[in-house]
């Protein structure tokens, strides 16, 4: 932990947070790309962090991008987009590009521009690529949308048949509370 960089932004589509600083420890929860975590301490290759929903758990240090308070404030003030499809890829070119990162519903990336029907975005650690405009939505617009019970049900029902993972909170694998989190 450093006082200069007390925050981290999850830089992977999904990061598993564990009850202890080792891969064999029980999974506590998951955090997805763009989630800010407060760094409490470092333990070897792990960081003990607190998530916005108050979980305290360990994340591999290489799963997050460590930042200052000013960088976190700038991230929060930037134009950001949220992934609104179950899974997609951030590609290095608008059409048929190489994968820069996989993405899942709820991932948050910073807006960098537009090329035709593709939005140029950057991951928290600065990797840039393109996503079709139909697969993302401006975060401020998404956050202010009207509650839609039918859409929530549609998302939940679409998850039927997906794999189960204790502590899972993404469209790849969920547990019961993760299903609720993904659906809303």
What are these language model-derived features?
Residues 10-33, 83-111:
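Beta-loop motif signature
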Residues 16, 48, 89, 120-122:
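Residue-level detector of beta-strand face positions
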Residues 24, 30, 102, 145, ...:
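Solvent-exposed, acidic/flexible segments
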Residues 38-47, 53:
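Short, solvent-exposed loop/edge-beta patches enriched in aromatic
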Residues 1-13, 32-35, 41-42:
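Charged, low-complexity interaction regions that mediate assembly/partner binding
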Residues 149-184:
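Catalytic cores of peptidoglycan-degrading enzymes
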Residues 22, 41-45, 114-117:
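Short, conserved beta-turn/loop elements at beta-strand boundaries and strand-helix junctions
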């Amino acid at each position: 932990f450093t006082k200069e960089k007390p925050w981290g932004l999850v830089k992977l589509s999904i990061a598993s947070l564990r009850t202890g600083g080792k891969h064999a420890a029980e999974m506590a929860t998951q955090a997805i790309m763009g989630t800010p975590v407060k760094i409490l301490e470092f333990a070897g290759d792990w960081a003990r962090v607190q998530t916005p929903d108050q979980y305290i758990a360990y994340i591999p240090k290489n799963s997050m991008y460590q930042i200052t308070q000013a960088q976190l404030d700038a991230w929060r003030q930037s134009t950001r987009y949220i992934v609104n499809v179950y899974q997609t890829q951030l590609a290095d070119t608008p059409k048929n590009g190489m994968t820069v990162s996989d993405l899942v519903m709820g991932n948050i990336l910073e807006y960098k521009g537009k090329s035709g029907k593709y939005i140029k975005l950057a991951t928290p650690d600065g990797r840039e690529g393109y996503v079709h405009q139909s697969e993302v939505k401006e975060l401020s617009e998404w956050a202010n949308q009207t509650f839609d019970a039918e859409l929530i049900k549609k998302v939940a029902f679409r998850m039927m048949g997906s794999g189960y993972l204790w502590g899972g909170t993404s469209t790849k694998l969920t547990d019961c509370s993760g299903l609720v989190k993904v659906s809303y």
